[in-house]
Amino acid sequence: MGVDNLQLEPSVTPWSVDGSIDYDKLIKKFGTHKITDALLKKLKSIIGEIHPLLQVDFFFSHRDFDWILDRYIQGEKFYLYTGRGPSGMSHLGHLMPWLFTKHLQDKFDAPLLFQMTDDEKFLYGQDNSMEKIAKYTQENILDVIAIGFRPDRTKIIIDTKHIRYLYSMAIEIAKRITFSTAKAVFGFKNSTNIGMIGFPAIQAVPCFLPSLIEKKPTPVLIPAAIDQDPYWRITRDIAEKMGYYKPAQIHSKFLPSLESSGKMSSSKPESALLTTDSSEVIENKISLAFTGGQPTVSLQRKLGGNPDACPVFSYLRYLFDSPRNSTERAINCRSGNLLCGECKHDLSSNSVIFISEFQKQREKAKDKVSEFIYEGYSTETIG
């Protein structure tokens, strides 16, 4: 994913994330709300626990998550909606919002619509053929199923396959969003193809499909990385005019690149741990990973490291360490009592185990694909 449309420092768009991200500044820029202790307390009072990804602040921002909880308390169910742009093989950064989405599905018994935006990836990538995107779509679907979503509560929408279920709603949405608005939000230029200009209306459709399925306005919660927020911003602007609730969101941070700044990217395999990587490849990538440590052992012992700038620390914190262990690891890093090689060893061993187990579930998913594919709201209800 990469585009030169929005010139942010650093750059954060639905197609590109470059540089080191200041998430507090991003909250202000996008106009979202920080997840507070009070909101977490409210969530815990409903489901009895706080997911580790909330405890370590990986999910950090929201729009109307408090409203979703209020509606749920009042007895109104909500749908989940998230997705994937199939431009390559999936990596651990993709899995993290999906793992959290599964947690929400389990705790709230919420139906999930999962959108595969194969059309977007074809339109955006100059070198992407439909054949290549179709291959990645099928591969990515296996990753989604391997997460463990319930087939009776989960339906996967493939835009090009299911456009007949999306188009009527898409043009209703498109009619209400001006080019001026889309240009301001996404930074479209004269060189932008007209397919990309119209695509945001397609991505907005699953925000409102649950209302068609349920035959009444139905709340929707979108767990996704913060770079996708511009889509929901324009969708929220028109939702009530169309007779629907504004979609709520809960935003995650990015799993950083193994190479240093920016996010993990499947278009740069050396920067990411892919779900299809062998144990040897995983170990090699981690051994070469950038760290926040000093150039020599003696300097590390003397000066300590910087876990805040270390992708190895981030992976351990968000994926494998408990919040308490992560805090202890950071203290030991800064004091010089912990060396980068020790953290790399911990990450390597944990990643090999996690990905090898995930690959077993991925293999089993090949026999389950048909159970998850969407068949249209007119013939099937998943709520």
Roles of regions detected by a PLM:
Residues L69-G75, Q105-K107, P200-A201:
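Short glycine/proline-enriched loop/turn "hinge" motifs that connect secondary-structure elements
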Residues M1-G85, K155, V220, R236-S287, ...:
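Non-catalytic terminal extensions that flank enzyme cores
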Residues Y124, M130-A248:
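Divalent-metal (Mg2+/Mn2+/Ca2+)-assisted nucleotide/phosphate chemistry catalytic cores
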Residues G93-F114:
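Histidine-anchored nucleotide/phosphate-binding helix
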Residues G305-A309:
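Small-residue-rich helix-loop
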Residues G85-H94:
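Short, glycine-rich nucleotide/cofactor-binding loops
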Residues H91, V144, D227, S261, ...:
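Divalent metal-coordination and catalytic microenvironments
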